Curated annotation (Swiss-Prot):
Pfam family, one: Cytidylate_kin
Superkingdom of source: Bacteria
Similarity section: Belongs to the cytidylate kinase family. Type 1 subfamily.
Gene3D superfamilies associated with the record: P-loop containing nucleotide triphosphate hydrolases
Record: residues binding ATP: G12, P13, S14, G15, A16, G17, K18, G19, T20
Catalytic activity: CMP + ATP = CDP + ADP; dCMP + ATP = dCDP + ADP
E.C. code: 2.7.4.25
Main subcellular location: cytoplasm
Name of the protein: Cytidylate kinase
InterPro entries reported in the protein's UniProt record: Cytidylate_kin, Cytidylate_kinase_dom, P-loop_NTPase
Compartment(s): Cytoplasm
CDD domains noted in UniProt: CMPK
Length: 227
């Protein structure tokens, strides 16, 4: 039987704040949380371990089905990710992993293979789904949809600050180029290109604090939930 538990989708480009906002909103609502980007990154890690070529869709699809991905949700503190039993949480946040995940996500067969795995996260009392096609492809029937955006410069600045705080040396210019290239790949791919659902609420997070965005999203749910 199809689970009809409520779903809030939060889509947007890399660095728009959807991961942080989604985790906090899910924790406050007491709902489950799906980080679809982490799922693609996890497959990317497994593919790199197996030294697979992104030009070999059949091998990547086999890898997708053979890879066991587990999420240990720590609420607002973040998400711990295991690939075949190994903790890869820190590896998932590397820029190289993100680039590989973006390339893999452009392969229709891989997206199809992961579709039902993502939909399986939908269960009571509800789900907050964070990604790029949550509201358009994975959960088109979601009652609540949000699309977060921000300028490429704003997103590069946020990422640069995060990496510098972790002791990772990278230039703002390099990050900006990577983000702009990723935006182009995500928007131009044939299957499930990055775009806002027609019924999504658009929120530009440029210059806005995380808590303000969280309050707007939680308020949206409150306004649209029958009393």
């Amino acid at each position: 039987m199809t689970d009809l538990s409520p779903v809030l989708t939060i889509d947007g480009p890399s660095g728009a704040g959807k991961g942080t906002v989604s985790r906090i909103v899910a924790a406050r609502l007491g709902w489950h949380y799906l980080d679809s980007g982490a799922l693609y990154r996890a497959v990317g890690v497994a593919a790199s371990w197996a030294d697979l070529d992104v030009s070999d869709p059949a091998a990547l699809v086999r890898c997708t089905f053979d890879t066991k991905v587990e999420f240990d949700d720590a609420g607002e503190a973040g998400l711990r990710v295991l690939v075949n039993g190994a903790d890869v949480t820190s590896e998932l946040r590397l820029e190289t992993t993100g680039a590989l995940a973006s390339a893999i996500a452009a392969i229709p067969e891989v997206r199809s293979a992961l579709k039902e795995r993502q939909r399986a996260f939908r269960r009571a009392p509800g789900l907050v789904a964070d990604g790029r096609d949550m509201g358009t492809v994975i959960f088109p029937d979601a009652a609540f949809k949000v699309f977060l955006t921000a300028s490429a410069e704003e997103r590069a600045g946020r990422r640069h600050k995060q990496l510098m705080e972790k002791g990772v040396s990278v230039t703002f210019a390099d990050l900006l180029r990577e983000i702009m290239a990723r935006d182009a790949r995500d928007a131009q791919r044939v299957v499930a290109p990055l775009r806002s659902a027609k019924d999504a609420v658009l929120i530009d997070t440029s210059g806005i604090g995380v808590e303000d965005v969280v309050q707007r999203v939680v308020g949206l749910l409150a306004d649209r939930t029958p009393s």
